[in-house]
């Protein structure tokens, strides 16, 4: 069975192995054992309540319980930019006009921005390529919304997600070559690694503070502004079906889009509800425990021992019927409450 739970120290080796499969461009999961160990400790301290909001970050793992192996990760940063500045580019417009010359021209422009300071961020989503099936990807991504819904008081009024921008098969970023390289004089992979390991001072020191005219960039750089890496297209689609949208902000390194939404308007947060657990073995006549039913995300309401699974079921009342195996995976007993939401919006066909 596949289940999502909070990260533990024993997961370090598996996460380090996963980090080696990400490739260039995923700044939040570098293959650096010391950094990953510190990331795990920060998550544990977040759950223990010993950090300020600007330092808090939750890290979840997807575990294959049969193999006893972590095969995916996803995370939530509680409030970005409160300790280290949070940078991106806002794609805006400057107008140049002259009545005397009868000239009026609007020019697309990149403005360095800290507009998302204080927002909660969905980040560090990565699934082992061998497990990109059976709806594991949407499960690992959307389970964070159930956690946010259950513990809404810990999160901002807005949620954002920086999507990995376009790089070619050699890890080359056209956007970086046309923008970042001129100011940093280092390779994209190096800047990507430094940022991912928390060494971000160079961004503030070297990034241009004045607007950049998009028309001055190379054509291939202009073409990838707001575009995602091909491997990130499914992750973007998952978030967009939940209500997150691109509002004209892009990553300063690779030009990838930032998606955002009001937290309470996210479909899985808004539509999630509680059910009371009933435990019974599967019966062919049982309409509720049905392998052909709609797919649902189901999670317990235990903050420190959060668990979530995917299950097929039909909802007929305020109760949720679980098999003993599902109840054990969730860590719940009969009479406990669980939070549930359909994996996909009712109008979305999967």
Curated annotation (Swiss-Prot):
Coiled coil region boundaries: none
Gene3D superfamilies for the chain: 2.40.40.20
One BP term from GO: arginine catabolic process to glutamate
Keywords of the record: Acyltransferase, Arginine metabolism, Transferase
Pathway: Amino-acid degradation; L-arginine degradation via AST pathway; L-glutamate and succinate from L-arginine: step 1/5
Active site positions, chain numbering: 229 (proton donor)
UniProt keyword Acyltransferase, yes or no: yes
Binding site for succinyl-CoA: 125
EC number assigned by the record: 2.3.1.109
Catalytic reaction annotation: succinyl-CoA + L-arginine = N(2)-succinyl-L-arginine + CoA + H(+)
Single GO molecular function: arginine N-succinyltransferase activity
Stored NCBIfam families: arg_catab_AOST (TIGR03243), arg_catab_AstA (TIGR03244), PRK10456.1 (NF007770)
HAMAP family recorded: AstA (MF_01171)
Database matches in PANTHER family: ARGININE N-SUCCINYLTRANSFERASE, N-SUCCINYLARGININE DIHYDROLASE
Similarity comment: family membership: Belongs to the arginine N-succinyltransferase family.
Purpose of the protein: Catalyzes the transfer of succinyl-CoA to arginine to produce N(2)-succinylarginine.
Designated name of the protein: Arginine N-succinyltransferase
Protein's gene: astA
């Amino acid at each position: 069975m596949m289940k999502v739970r909070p990260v533990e120290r024993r997961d370090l080796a598996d996460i380090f192995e996963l980090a080696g499969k990400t490739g260039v461009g995923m700044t939040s999961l570098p293959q650096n054992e010391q950094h990953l160990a510190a990331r795990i400790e920060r998550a544990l301290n977040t759950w223990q309540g010993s950090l300020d909001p600007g330092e808090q970050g939750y890290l979840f793992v997807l575990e294959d319980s049969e193999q006893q192996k972590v095969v995916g990760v996803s995370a939530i940063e509680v409030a970005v930019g409160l300790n280290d500045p949070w940078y991106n580019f806002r794609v805006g417009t400057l107008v140049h006009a002259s009545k005397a010359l009868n000239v009026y021209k609007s020019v697309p422009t990149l403005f360095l921005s800290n507009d998302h300071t204080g927002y909660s961020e969905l980040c560090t989503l990565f699934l082992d390529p061998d497990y990109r099936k059976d709806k594991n990807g949407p499960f690992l991504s959307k389970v964070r919304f159930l956690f946010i819904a259950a513990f809404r008081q810990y999160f901002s009024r807005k949620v954002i997600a920086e999507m990995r921008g376009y790089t070619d098969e050699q890890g080359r970023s056209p956007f970086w070559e046309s923008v970042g390289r001129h100011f940093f004089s280092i390779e994209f992979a190096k800047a990507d690694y430094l940022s991912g390991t928390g060494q971000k001072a160079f961004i503030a020191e070297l990034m241009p503070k004045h607007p950049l005219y998009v028309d001055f960039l190379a054509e291939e750089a202009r073409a990838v502004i707001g575009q995602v890496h091909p491997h990130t297209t499914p992750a973007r689609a998952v978030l967009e079906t939940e209500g997150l949208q691109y509002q004209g902000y892009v990553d300063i390194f690779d030009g990838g889009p930032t998606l955002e939404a009001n937290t309470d308007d996210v479909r899985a947060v808004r539509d999630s509800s509680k059910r009371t657990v009933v435990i019974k073995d599967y019966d062919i006549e049982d309409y509720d425990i049905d392998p052909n039913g709609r797919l649902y995300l189901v999670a317990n309401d235990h903050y420190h021992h959060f668990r979530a699974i995917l299950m097929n079921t039909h909802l007929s009342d305020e109760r949720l019927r679980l098999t003993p195996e599902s109840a054990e995976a969730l860590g719940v007993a009969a009479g406990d409450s669980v939070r549930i939401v359909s994996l996909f919006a009712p109008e979305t066909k999967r």
